[in-house]
UniProtKB/Swiss-Prot annotation:
Protein name, per record: Ribonuclease Z
Naturally occurring in which organism (per UniProt): Pseudomonas putida (strain W619)
Keywords of this entry: Endonuclease, Hydrolase, Metal-binding, Nuclease, tRNA processing, Zinc
Cofactor note: Binds 2 Zn(2+) ions.
InterPro entries membership: Metallo-B-lactamas, RibonucZ/Hydroxyglut_hydro, RNase_Z/BN
Binding residue positions for Zn(2+) 2: 66-67, 209, 268
Amino acid sequence: MDLLFLGTSAGVPTKARNVSATAVIEASGSHWYLVDCGEGTQHQLLHTPLSVRDLRAIFITHVHGDHCFGLPGLLASAGMSGRTAPLDLVLPAALHDWVRLSLAASDSFLPFELRLLAVEQLGEWRSDTLAVSTVQLSHRVPSVAFVFTELNPEPRLDVQRLDAEGIPRGPLWGELAKGLTVEHAGRMLHGRDYLRASRPARRVIVCGDNDNPELLAEAAKDVDVLVHEATFTQPIIARTGVSFGHSSAAAVARFAETAGVRNLVLTHFSARYQPDPRRSPCIDEVREEAQVHYSGNLTLAQDLQRYHIGRDGCLGRVTGI
């Protein structure tokens, strides 16, 4: 299971960072999910191995443009690339008409079914490998975090149950191991009932804009990776007296330490933070502030950088993408 950051800047792009977009990639390495789609996201995708034909769903955290203005272009390009499979788009209900109008007014034809789902009524979204739920956050507009949880990872046959039910070893077991339904002694046996996860499911939280990390306290229990905004450092907020509904690196780090988060990834950095350490404010100041309060595995997300979440839940940087 991987994370690939397509945009890590808050509000506006910079020369080094595009606006918000994060790819969550299945363990298989092919299918993937997109959280937020700021302007220029499809351009970022051109620098990755990801294909819009393999995109399973898009999840938008809130209505602000740096998280959604890339949608019309990405959807139109998906159609032009030959995509035909239906696509679920989970986003605030307030954006549904905007998406429809953007496509209609630009005479954009989609050769696939676009299913618009209101994030406010989502409950839980599922594919065959992942479950996605939401956590309400605190921002100037309604905002959510998306919690990705693996379903039945690396399933193995429940041999004890098979033996207990007298199901003979052989071809039947092979079919059940594939998740198929078979008939035995007048009974219909469903593969899903005889498969058990061989390891703990990995869990990842990808947050929208949020000024109160404590709202994640329940969801963050036993989470492997927390991806959270760190738009400002504390001195900037203290000097200006406003946070605009965003978090400081210190606030997120303190929460992650208290919650026992193993891997903390900070993203959504204000454009004022430069990559050049000779200039101030510099992105290194975000890292330094977080390190004071957090002793776990800290990562500052970088555009077009891929990170792998191992079977043991450890997060590591991938060389190349």
